[in-house]
Amino acid sequence: MLYPTEFDVIVVGGGHAGTEAALASARMGNKTLLLTHNIETLGQMSCNPSIGGIGKGHLVKEVDALGGAMAAATDEGGIQFRILNSSKGPAVRATRAQADRILYKAAIRHRLENQPNLWLFQQSVDDLMVEGDRVVGAVTQVGVRFRSRAVVLTAGTFLDGKIHVGLNNYTGGRAGDPAAVSLSARLKELKLPQGRLKTGTPPRIDGRTIDFSKLEEQPGDLDPIPVFSFLGRVEQHPRQVPCWVTHTNAQTHDIIRSGLDRSPMYTGVIEGVGPRYCPSIEDKIHRFASKESHQIFLEPEGLTTNEFYPNGISTSLPFDVQLELVRSMVGLEHAHILRPGYAIEYDYFDPRGLKASLETKAISGLFFAGQINGTTGYEEAAAQGLLAGINAGLYVQSKGPWCPRRDQAYLGVLVDDLVTRGVSEPYRMFTSRAEYRLSLREDNADMRLTEIGRELGVVDDVRWDAFSRKRDAVSRETERLRTTWVNPKTLSSEEATALLGKPIDHEYSLADLLRRPGVSYDGICGLREGTCGPDEALAHDDVLLAQIKEQIEIGVKYQGYIERQAGEIERNEAHENTRLPENLDYTEVRGLSFEARQKLTQFRPETIGQASRISGITPAAISLLMVHLKRGLGRRAPRPAGAGNDNSPVAQ
């Protein structure tokens, strides 16, 4: 049957990508439907019970700055918070939290069920409704047909998923959930470029059988306890608990090696490529054969369960080997496994078949987000989901897409890497992937993105008010530091020595003093000449005050480096966003090598910037392209069948 209500946007899948996509589209005022195979698993943490980390925490902060749910849900469900790289520079500091699975999932579901313009429906999707080169809806397992103007597909590991434990395997999207076999077959019919990837998860352990007295305790940060959302409060956190650390040993490694003849990875049963930066314990032992021990973190799954997640032993070895290797580690000698670890193979679609908006090039109105694009991780999925939801919303409103730049957000780095370089293994975000990481810090994600989010319609009044107060306070106080001067007469030798280690010998601005090593903003405020009086409205908001102080201190101390990077960005921007005609005939570009013509024709970059990052495209090739465009020779090749529309301005 055809469902009587027509929607603007349909989101397929209720994981981290799907929930952010649905919420973003609905916040923009679009009539949005979220289709999920099981409403009880909305926002489920399928693997590790944690959010954030190096690079990943940056993405979560950006999602939050754009009004997303992940950071806020983590504040409500987080049972341990830490700042990683706290002793290093601000560019690489990152927030990480352990989350109670049940509380996190409840926080996400609460937001979905209370979001205006958003409807939920429980049914697996077996088919997409496509008319010509345009998607017009989705069909569920029992034949209910939902019409829409755009569809966001966030299928996770469910597309033709196959679960492996030893040499036993069965179809599944994750343990306990069915695979989306029919939908996968339908997507293959649409001739979208497809491949197979693999990921895995460790066995879960009953905490009652762990001897914690033999383990190293790892508490979270307590002074202060971090928050994830820019609107978060420590009071939102539930009870905080520690993690625990054990190690593999020579016996563990021997056990693993003895089981490799029954490993689906080492017997050729699994064909998909696994994540390089989250390897299975089999891979670790094989790749790092000389390493005598690997650190294993025992992470609590929640406050109302005894289940522990042993981070570091993801495996698809047979269950008897899993049990033996777990019990070979200190503190786990009598451990009981509650759930076996497993590997899962699944379909993904080459992200080079996407526009930078995450819309497929072949089918108008169809957007992909999350693991379907070859990424791994909750945070990468949430960021893509948010962007796909925003751009699906803009699409149905007949507006141009928003495609964040590499110098604007880690989200821009993520998407640009995917659509220009593709993936040969599951993609994970790191700070090292961002060439402008000093400008793309966790602390300034709101300064970079919240104003854009407000214009897009995804930032509400509460967030906008808090952001505006913070932005204005940072601006006023930074200016005061630059224009307030002290000299040997106004700054006593005692104060100067206490702050700087010696008296000053001539006039300095307070900003000059703050730039000195070891001098903090609080230290400057402790001077008689440096006393600052925060707005009365901010005086009782400790979290906002801490954010303001951090922004001021980083902005002043790193001003020279930030300005230098801004200059570099400006120079590179000259041609970064110069658009290429969608169907430019690269065989007509004089001087291009055969390889360059072949790759440009295959991947069809949208901009000069994207073209420059395709493997094998040299600076000389880019120069030839620019000359071709300036001569007005950007003639279009015959339009390929099924090509989508793109209303964005192009260089002609």
From Swiss-Prot:
Pfam families: GIDA, GIDA_C_1st, SAM_GIDA_C. Keywords: Cytoplasm, FAD, Flavoprotein, NAD, tRNA processing. One of its GO terms (cellular component) is cytosol. The keyword Lipid metabolism does not apply. Its cofactor is FAD. GO terms for biological process: tRNA methylation; tRNA wobble uridine modification. It is found in: Cytoplasm. GO terms for molecular function: flavin adenine dinucleotide binding. InterPro entries: FAD/NAD-bd_sf (IPR036188), GIDA_C_N (IPR049312), MnmG (IPR004416), MnmG-rel (IPR002218), MnmG-rel_CS (IPR020595), MnmG_C (IPR026904), MnmG_C_subdom (IPR047001), MnmG_C_subdom_sf (IPR044920). PROSITE patterns: GIDA_1, GIDA_2. FAD binds at residues 13-18. NAD(+) binds at residues 274-288. NAD-binding protein involved in the addition of a carboxymethylaminomethyl (cmnm) group at the wobble position (U34) of certain tRNAs, forming tRNA-cmnm(5)s(2)U34. Belongs to the MnmG family. NCBIfam families: mnmG_gidA. Homodimer. Heterotetramer of two MnmE and two MnmG subunits. This is tRNA uridine 5-carboxymethylaminomethyl modification enzyme MnmG. It comes from Paraburkholderia phymatum (strain DSM 17167 / CIP 108236 / LMG 21445 / STM815) (Burkholderia phymatum). The lineage of its organism: Bacteria, Pseudomonadati, Pseudomonadota, Betaproteobacteria, Burkholderiales.
